[in-house]
Amino acid sequence: MAADEHGGETGDAAAEGIRAEPKGTAPTPLSVLDLVTVGAGRTATDALRTSVTLAKQAESRGYHRHWVAEHHSMPGVASSSPAVILAHLAAHTTRIRLGSGGVMLPNHAPLVIAEQFGTLEALAPGRVDLGLGRAPGTDGATAAALRRSDQLNEGADDFPQQLAELTRFLDDDFPDGHPYARIHAVPGPVQSTSPGGVQSPHRPPIWLLGSSGFSARLAGMLGLPFAFAHHFSAQNTLPALDLYRDTFRPSAVLDAPYALIGVSALATDDENEARRQVMAAALNMVRLRTGRPGLVPTPEEAEAHQFTEMERDFITSWNSNVIHGTADQVRSGLDDLAKRTGADELMLTANAHSGDIRLRSYELVADAYGLPNPA
């Protein structure tokens, strides 16, 4: 297939991996954002096993995607290497789309990302998404260690150039005379054109992720799908989505905008239990924001914590954007959010100390919307 400058392959194959139809009574397709959270008293092994169970459960219940986020130097988040985790999830699933939500492009050489996601596409043909962000996903010192440079703005400032380079590697179409013209990302298209080669898998669709206007504008100008981090930047959601739609230019990938929003949502069997779990997750966020990252505390630890006035103000603001409660309450909140934003897809992240609580939340939401239940 032909390729455009940034969007990649043309035709229906690219769009098929992006657009989806709602299931049950859900207002949009529903998907999963997995931070691979590690609770106090638990290990990274426990968290990764929960992720496998969650991916299998999400697939069976009709969730459309399972994305893994990239974060570094955070004891309570075990998703420092999305590509490795996604390869493991691919071995345990057969239909659900798997992707990065996202890979932080400035932290990596574009060629390495092209090779990693070419490998993932070879492992799970036709169901891999490449979500890209420009934030470091960590603090400044860790970002410097990842990039082997103390010029922290260097990667973010030339994000459009990095994106163009990554796309060239994915499509194997550097122009003649370019320094990288003889370099090929493998697995990739070069294998199709080599002697004895056969058609290689379609390369993963690129998504741009963001929490402000920069990525919204860039995604619109390039005609790419856009994923907005409503779960930690709710005040910017509507302006960013408006900007994306206003600047959108039809491309080889999409003929109309497609906007996904990440939503923090936790459903439990009991409303009070939801409040307890959300408070514990909020305490974890307070500690992260004040330079004291740790494992996600238990609800009991959060109840015993002596909150300062500043911490209480932060938590009140933070929790106001977490949709939580019983399944009916969460369904109502998601319906309202979809209506207010016009989002094409909702991606839910359930942050809690316990993996069982997280798994139960996705089950309850699926039940509330009448999603498929093979049991």
Regions found by a protein language model. Give the residues of each.
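N-terminal beta1-alpha1-beta2 module of alpha/beta enzyme domains
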Residues: 1-98
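Conserved, mostly hydrophobic/aromatic
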Residues: 30, 58, 62, 70, ...
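Acidic (Asp/Glu)-rich catalytic clusters
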Residues: 22-25, 59, 86-94, 117, ...
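An alpha-helical appendage that flanks or caps ligand/catalytic pockets
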Residues: 2-5, 14-24, 152-188, 236-342, ...
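Active-site mouth loops of central-metabolism enzymes
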Residues: 34-49, 103-111, 200-210, 318-327
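Flexible, glycine-rich active-site loops centered on histidine and acidic residues
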Residues: 25-44, 106-174, 226
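Hydrophobic faces of well-ordered beta-strands that scaffold small-molecule active sites
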Residues: 30-34, 66-68, 98-100, 128-132, ...
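A conserved active-site cap/scaffold subdomain adjacent to cofactor or substrate pockets
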Residues: 212-235, 240-241
